[in-house]
Amino acid sequence: MTRSDLPGLTDLHAYPYAVHWHGPAGSALAYIDEGPPQARPIVLLHSVPTWGYAFRSVIPWLVQAGLRVLVPDLLGCGRSDKPPEPAAHGLGAQLNSLSQWMQDLGLHNTTLYGQGLGGLLAFRLAILQSERVERLAL
């Protein structure tokens, strides 16, 4: 397992959000959680090979609109763990990780937004977690 400790991924002026962790060591998701905890959640899912930083300009607007904004870095991307096994970066592993994350955070009435691979993951999550997802934007 490799966790990114590159200086370029920390202390970013345009991305001043606290990093939270979910999952076991070696396959933990890094994510940000901004806005009121009881507000309606929106989950922003990035494409590959980028990371949550791609959403830096929209996060403040969504928080200002009164939403709870959650932005996970997919496994193998950004600040999330980078398991050495190729299968750990596959669609199934990403879906399992994100599904468990949504369950453990108790997300409901969630809007999922995805771009690129994040769009495919959002679509699949909307099916797998239909009781938690209210809206889908691709």
Segments the model singles out, each with a brief description of its role:
Residues M1-I42, Q64-L67, L107-H108:
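Alpha/beta-hydrolase fold catalytic core
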Residues G26, I32, V71-Y113:
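Active-site loop/oxyanion-hole signature of alpha/beta-hydrolase fold enzymes
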Residues I32-D81:
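Conserved HGGG/HGGXW glycine-rich cap/lid loop of the alpha/beta-hydrolase fold
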Residues A54, Q94, L125:
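Acidic donor-diphosphate engagement hotspot in glycosyltransferases and nucleotidyltransferases
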Residues L107-L138:
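Conserved hydrolase catalytic core segment
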